[in-house]
């Protein structure tokens, strides 16, 4: 058995793999890959997927749930276009690569982008606390979890401006209050399902109010809210697999139970990092992610030796991003606790070798 700590696409439950693979061969007489998105069987899939999102996250009345394509990278543009108002000013909290990409897209569509807080001064190893949002901002945008640097907002920022969040890498991993947000978007391939679909949760009152002179029909969230995500052919298989994964999530206690499991896994690994003299955490303690744990070796001369050891034990995907170096253990919902125990045992064994 391989233990997948890769940053994404994410590990999924074996039950989901099995059901999805069976549907590729036979989904009510056809393959899920060839069924029409207008067929009642797939309409039922889409309806269930939307309802599962609402149930899992306790989405209140007055919000629309939408499945699109393009990943969070398109979400940077969609969010900026749809939330543009008369001031054409947007505040962003800069916590790393994905925040900077979102800021760049907002500039391209015509916003004056205001960096209201940043952790760039320490290579993004903490979450900035002194967030000062310009009162004229159309919205405040932030990335809730940073896969590359291993930081995560424990508490969501407060603002009088509408709040937008890229939750691609921690959606469904912990409880949130959806009512705090005007717009949430998330690529599927971290906790929701396979790559190919993107989730949007948008406040209905925010729809149809963009002042952008250039808002194509497809990029207008109102288009998709009115058509129940069926304006054009949706990504049928990714939506189906995501629906299966959300079924599995709810069958196993929902987001509340997933959060407890995720916190247990993270605590186990952080405890080893903090107490093993051969390793050190890359992130300040209060802001450590429970999804993507970044750590370094105290003696880089032994890197090859440690790499050989963890690979020998069928651990995969541990190499850190070049921006940080070291190691990154991505521990999404479906990663079993046993996989974390194997990693911790490998680290203990490495330390015992002196």
What does each model-identified segment do?
Residues 2, 328-354:
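PLP-dependent enzyme catalytic core of the Aspartate aminotransferase-like
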Residues 2-50:
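A glycine-/small-polar-enriched, mobile loop at the entrance of the PLP active site in fold-type I
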Residues 29-75, 82, 97, 105:
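Conserved N-terminal alpha-helix of the aminotransferase class I/II PLP-enzyme fold
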Residues 84-100:
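Conserved PLP-anchoring active-site segment centered on the Schiff-base-forming lysine
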Residues 106, 118-171:
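Active-site phosphate-binding strand-loop segment of PLP-dependent enzymes
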Residues 164, 178-189:
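Conserved active-site segment immediately N-terminal to the catalytic lysine
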Residues 188-270, 284, 353-354:
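Active-site C-terminal subdomain of aminotransferase-like
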Residues 279-309:
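Conserved PLP-binding catalytic core of the aspartate aminotransferase-like
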């Amino acid at each position: 058995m391989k233990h997948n700590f890769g940053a994404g696409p994410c590990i999924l439950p074996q039950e989901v793999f099995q059901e999805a693979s069976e549907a590729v061969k036979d989904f009510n007489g056809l393959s899920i890959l060839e069924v029409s998105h207008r067929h009642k069987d797939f309409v039922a899939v889409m309806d269930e997927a939307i309802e599962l999102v609402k149930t899992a996250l306790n989405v209140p009345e007055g919000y629309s749930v939408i499945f699109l394509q393009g990943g969070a990278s398109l979400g940077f543009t969609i969010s900026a276009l749809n939330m543009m108002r008369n001031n054409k000013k947007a505040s962003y909290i800069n916590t790393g690569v994905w925040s900077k990409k979102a800021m760049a897209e907002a500039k391209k569509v015509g916003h004056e982008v205001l960096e209201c807080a940043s952790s760039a001064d320490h290579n993004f190893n903490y979450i900035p606390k002194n967030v000062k949002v310009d009162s004229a901002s159309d919205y405040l945008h932030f990335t809730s979890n940073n896969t590359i640097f291993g930081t995560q907002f424990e508490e969501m920022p407060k603002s009088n401006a509408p709040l937008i969040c890229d939750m691609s890498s921690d959606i469904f991993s912990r409880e949130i209050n959806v009512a705090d947000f005007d717009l949430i978007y998330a690529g599927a391939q971290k906790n929701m399902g396979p790559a190919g679909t993107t989730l949007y949760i948008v406040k209905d009152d925010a729809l149809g109010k963009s002042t952008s002179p250039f808002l194509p029909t497809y990029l207008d969230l109102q288009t998709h809210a009115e058509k129940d995500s069926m304006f054009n052919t949706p990504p049928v298989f990714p939506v189906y697999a995501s629906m299966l994964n959300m079924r599995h999530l709810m069958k196993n206690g929902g987001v509340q139970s997933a959060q407890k499991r995720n916190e247990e896994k993270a605590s186990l690994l952080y405890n080893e990092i903090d107490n093993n003299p051969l390793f050190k955490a890359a992130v300040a303690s209060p802001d450590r992610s429970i999804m993507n744990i970044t750590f370094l070796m105290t003696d880089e001369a032994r890197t090859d030796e440690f790499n050989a050891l963890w690979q020998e034990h069928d651990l995969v995907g541990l190499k850190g991003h070049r921006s940080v170096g070291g190691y990154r253990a991505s521990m999404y919902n479906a990663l079993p606790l046993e996989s974390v125990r194997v990693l911790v045992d490998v680290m203990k064994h490495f330390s015992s070798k002196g």
